[in-house]
Amino acid sequence: MLHKNGGLPIAIMDNDHVIAASGMSKREVLERRITKNLEELMENRSVHITTRDVPPMNAIEGLQRKANVVYPIVYGGDVAGAVALMQGDENHIPTETEIKLVQVAAAFLGKQME
């Protein structure tokens, strides 16, 4: 749904691996480990948003495609993973709508886990 509405690739991760993807080859990303940078972001319950001054984040090990927006999935005070809006074929600064879609998706998944 996020890929269809936003038009950019989406990845959903648990605390270790990519568990779902849309808009990019699933064989390319499923079961790949997340990077240490993403682990730290999730542990700190931080958010990553690419801007003109903030570069995209390397979120998935061994993948050249980087993440433009990352929100952690939090439920009951624990972090269960993250939702990432990945780069498309071109460099792209995410819009407010795209940022909000990722934020809502992460919040929704967190609520579903409670």
Predicted segments with their positions:
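Juxtadomain coupling helices with adjacent low-complexity linkers
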Residues: M1-N5, R33-E39, H48, A82, ...
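Short hydrophobic/glycine-rich mini-motifs in sensory/regulatory modules
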Residues: I73-V83
